[in-house]
Amino acid sequence: MEEKTYLKWYNKVGYGTGDIAGNVVYAFLSSFVMIYLTNTVGLNSGIVGTLIAVSKLFDGVTDIFFGTMIDHTKSKMGKARPWMFYGFFGCAITLFGVFAIPTSLGKTAQYAWFFIAYTLLNAVFYTANNIAYAALTSLVTKNSKERVQMGSFRFMFSFGTNLVIQSVTVGAVEMFGGGATAWRTIAFIYCIIGIITNTLAVFSVKELSDEELKDDSVAGEEDDKLSFKQIIKLLFSNKYFSMICVIYILQQLRASMVNVGIFFMTYVLLNKNLFGVFSWANNIPLIIALAITPTLVSKMKGMYKLNKYSYMLATVCRLMVAVAGYLGSVPLMLIFTVLTSLGEGPWQGDMSAVIAQCSEHTYLKSGKRIDGSMFSCTSLGVKLGGGIGIALSGWMLDISGYINLDNAVQPDSCINMMYFMYLWLPFIFDIIITVILSFLNVESANMKLKENMQNQ
């Protein structure tokens, strides 16, 4: 029997625009905050890395806290949409703050300014906004195909925004005259774009009522009666939740190393404009793969095999990027970057649907629905993995003797470190992700649970 549909095409597209907002924050921050802080503000990369690492201590708590708050929320807008809507205004203010550090302040005050703005952005406002956004996948439809389509639209906008930001930001900063004022202007423009697109996404969908979301075959405790301790226990008793958390963290660590490309292109390939070219090679294939992911899921009768085998392809191709890098062949690096991205695309497209299946797994086993808390893995992974990745890149550059000047000649130790960070670490992370995906067959587990219930 055909599943009931809940969404029109414009609901899915409108929902997807929310990741334009998410990426004017995340892509801008992860790609350019380190080079802005070191080369424009003049801060030490090692100290910046340490501050980011300390900031991450808050994230694990706030992720699950906001997930729980979403589960307990009851309003005319629903559970998640209020948090998504109001949370982004805080994102905009604090993102601007990160890229508007006054040059007149002393170094200690500049470090403090950055730490406060960065922590509020990540641990509070981005957390509330992003968990709510991800949770909408479970709250606006019960149709598994529509959930995959929502994920595909979302990440098409995500990678499209990532592509634009990585391609135009360096040139835009130069166009506005360079220096602190230019970075502040660019940040302001991105904040306005984010507010507009986030608002569009919030009002493009409507959450289903609690009655509509219930499965009559499952009886259990109401989610708003669960304690914080009970929710934590439910989350980590679901092995698939833990797997997805680890994958998300590894993906963001990998993305942080790929974003070291701005340093690799500047000091190894001696052409910083290549960063935009590689961004195209990375993001355009992802967008293409996302567009066909719903069809591939249908043809392969599920997400598990598609995710496993496509990521195997991505891992092999990323190894070839490293080989091409040591050969000094930019064309070969670009070709294998394209193939890597094509392999990564299906998982990016159906990731939200897999998390929704993960949430369904907890519901089928316990009778307790904790969608908001379950989707905390998305924000936790993005912020913890991304933050540690940026911190790690700062530490590794500092240890290798990085000189924070645009036209500096970097020592051999630093050049070798850039090779390791940009070429080898992404490959290592891809291997681990592929292994975890080979065990992430939550669809099959849910089918067995439903069959057992029907036979009882």
Please provide the spans of the model-predicted regions.
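Membrane-embedded alpha-helical bundles of multi-pass transporters/translocases
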Residues: 2-456
